[in-house]
Amino acid sequence: MRFDLEPPSSVAAAHRIGVLLINLGTPDAPTPRAVRRYLAEFLSDPRVVEIPQAVWQVLLRTLILPLRGRASAKKYAAVWMPEGSPLRVYTERQTDSVRHLLTSNGYHVMVDYAMRYGSPNISHALTQFKRAGVERVLLMPMYPQYSASTTATAFDAAFDALARMRNQPEVRTVRHYADHPAYIHALAEQVRQYWAQHGRPDFAAGDKLVLSFHGVPKRTLDLGDPYHDQCQQTGALLMAALGLSTTECHVTFQSRFGKAEWLQPYTAPTLREFGEAGVRRADVFCPGFTADCLETIEEIGMEVRDEFLAGGGKTFHRIPCLNGASAWIGALSEIVAENLQGWPVKAAQPEPVN
């Protein structure tokens, strides 16, 4: 293995601490070419698609990318913001807000973000940390619930980058925070504030709140992935915080890909069934997505909405993700601070003068 070129080590180095927020990723532009490039990287990850690569790559390159590239580009174009991809825009804002909050509380740490797929990538971010004198790194995935296809592959990418370093930093990882009180509080506040502005569903009349999490193949549950259980745990805690029952609030799973069975119940068919059963209003919230993206804005806000209305529903509300909500920035900073304990994150105070 060839190691990265590095400057000579020095005892006078900065000895800084870095916090790296890691999200999934996004195409660089809403164009077929950019989307195909992004999907090629994403769908080539064996943590994401557990099919022998010799078979999968043929299907991916000859069938899936040519078909999905153009169709997905149209969807991205429908949600693209003036500043860029929603996921990148909101993740950048979250990073800036966490950095500001930690700094205002006396923390001397670098805070940056990276994407598992696309740019800025994890390897680049860790290299930038190293050049800035960072010797301790906290890897903070923006996935509250652990899954091998999200959290684990983010750690894989980080440790692959570290494997090329001769002088490695000390590293800590945040595995999940699905049941963290501050995270649950932020979720509940996001829902309450939305209802304060748009009206609360009439649950006595049969209205529904749906908590939609990203789906994964069911076989991953059978193979020991804790994701399903952690989604259910988050859902139960949020229901309790909102004072809702399981007849008023439902946990579902979205974004199914392929023909294999995924975690159920599926979001879109559930909303269709609600409409057909006479449910007049349905609100959908995505607790597992910490920032709005294609899957929340387009899939939930457009496709799932259309399913509900086509089934006979009358009013559909997509509650925005946590994004830059103050309760969430506070929660995220709290989780980061807890995982920095024991590291010299605050500047040494001068000795008092007698």
Swiss-Prot record:
**Which family is it part of?**
Belongs to the ferrochelatase family.
Family annotation (Gene3D superfamilies): 3.40.50.1400
The protein's superkingdom reads Bacteria
* Entry-linked PROSITE patterns: FERROCHELATASE
Q: What is its EC number?
A: 4.98.1.1
- Positions contributing to Fe cation binding: H214, E295
Q: In which pathway does it act?
A: Porphyrin-containing compound metabolism; protoheme biosynthesis; protoheme from protoporphyrin-IX: step 1/1
Protein's recorded name: Ferrochelatase
The main location is cytoplasm
Task of the protein: Catalyzes the ferrous insertion into protoporphyrin IX.
Q: Which reaction does it catalyse?
A: heme b + 2 H(+) = protoporphyrin IX + Fe(2+)
GO cellular component, alphabetical, reads: cytoplasm
Keywords noted in UniProt: Cytoplasm, Heme biosynthesis, Iron, Lyase, Metal-binding, Porphyrin biosynthesis
Q: Which GO terms describe its molecular function?
A: ferrochelatase activity; metal ion binding
Q: Which organism is it from?
A: Burkholderia orbicola (strain AU 1054)
Q: Where in the cell is it found?
A: Cytoplasm
Decide whether keyword Cytoplasm is in the record. Answer: yes
Q: Does the keyword Disulfide bond apply?
A: no
